[in-house]
A protein has these predicted regions:
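Active-site-adjacent loop and "lid" segments of alpha/beta metabolic enzymes
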Residues: 9, 34-51, 67-79, 105-128, ...
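Short, low-complexity, charge-dense intrinsically disordered segments
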Residues: 76-91, 96-99
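N-terminal glycine-rich anion-binding loops that anchor highly charged ligand groups
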Residues: 16-24, 51-64
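N-terminal amphipathic alpha-helix/helix-capping segment at the start of soluble metabolic enzymes
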Residues: 1-27, 212-215, 219, 272, ...
């Protein structure tokens, strides 16, 4: 039976385990693998979020930077504008170092740009739908703080609090909900990562370590949900064992989120005539994976296709209750 948790978001508590919660995805980005560019405009992003709420989303997750395979990520952008100005004023060498760093991460998204994308969407959604549970998908502490100030109640960090050294303290201070996701390496490194050995044991061990580190740093245990990060630094041959043995992650002692929506490993399984199924052709494969994950203990499913996921989750939940 799936364990029941009370997820403390600071402003309210969500019960996890009695039924599966559905987290709908809104990418305010030009380059996300599935829907990049579709919702970059503020009004389009808000309209999409409202559609997801109408379809039954329990949570809407809003992101302003893609972490698709091959994407450049910018942990350095997490440094606040004020602290950058201070360090730049201290010495010419700091200015030079900053210029070199900026050039190195020019393909990544700055905190300022990420905020420009997501903050108006979060603020307007909260104004129009004050009861909606909003999540911000970011690994930058400055973005997390501003987003929670605008109405987000959850910080969904794909790096598991590892890329921005201020993130753990920031989330502890904000007293919001948190999702710690597992990722091997950075997106630009994924194609060259060495084999992990037993991927399930690795993910379980590292997620547990990262969560316990966050607890020791002041993030209350009841605020944390763990995500094994399907597709994030995992090869085709590693995603299916992680799915098949998902129930083993329950030994971490934390509630679990699963995100397989439209992922490339599903597209490859559904390949036809030597070509992977495109993201828009992966719905039924996604639903099969989501149903299996719910039956193996997932508390939250993160998805682009909310209505379909809601219906699949109802059936999977009924099966769990019948055991």
């Amino acid at each position: 039976m799936r364990p029941v948790f009370q997820w403390n978001l600071g402003t309210r508590t969500l019960e996890l385990g009695k039924r599966t919660l559905i987290m709908g995805i809104v990418n305010v980005t030009p380059d996300s693998f599935s829907d990049g560019g579709q919702f970059l405009d503020r009004d389009q992003a808000i309209a999409q979020a409202e559609r997801l709420l109408d379809e039954g989303a329990d949570i809407v997750d809003i992101g302003g930077e893609s972490t698709r395979p091959g994407a450049r990520v910018n942990p350095g952008a997490a440094k606040s504008a004020e602290s950058r100005k201070t360090s730049d004023a201290n010495s010419k060498s700091a200015i030079a170092a900053s210029a070199v760093n900026a050039a190195a991460v020019s393909a990544a998204v700055s905190a300022e740009e990420e905020l420009r994308r997501v903050l108006p969407v979060i603020a307007e959604l909260k104004r129009k739908h004050p009861a909606a549970v909003l999540s911000v998908d970011t690994y930058k502490a400055d973005v997390a703080r501003a987003a929670v100030g605008a109405g987000a109640e959850i910080v969904n960090d794909v790096s598991g609090f590892r890329w921005d050294p201020r993130m753990t303290k920031t989330v502890a201070e904000l007293k919001c909900g948190a999702v710690l996701m597992h990722m091997r390496g950075r997106p630009e490194e994924w194609r060259t990562l060495p084999p992990p050995g037993d991927i399930v044991l690795l993910v379980k061990r590292e997620l547990k370590e990262w969560a316990e580190t966050a607890v020791l740093a002041g993030v209350r245990r009841e605020r944390i949900v763990l995500d094994p990060g399907f597709g994030f630094g995992k090869s085709f041959d590693e995603n299916y064992p992680l799915l098949a043995r998902f129930s083993e992650l329950q030994t971490t002692g934390f509630p679990l989120l699963a995100g397989t929506s439209r992922k490339s490993f599903i597209g490859r399984t559904l390949a036809s005539n030597g070509k992977d199924a495109p993201p828009e052709g992966r719905l039924y494969g996604t639903l099969a994976s989501q149903t299996a994950l719910i039956l193996k203990g997932a508390h939250i499913v993160r998805t682009h296709d909310v209505k379909a996921a809601v219906e699949a989750a109802r059936v999977a939940d009924a099966i769990l209750l019948a055991r």
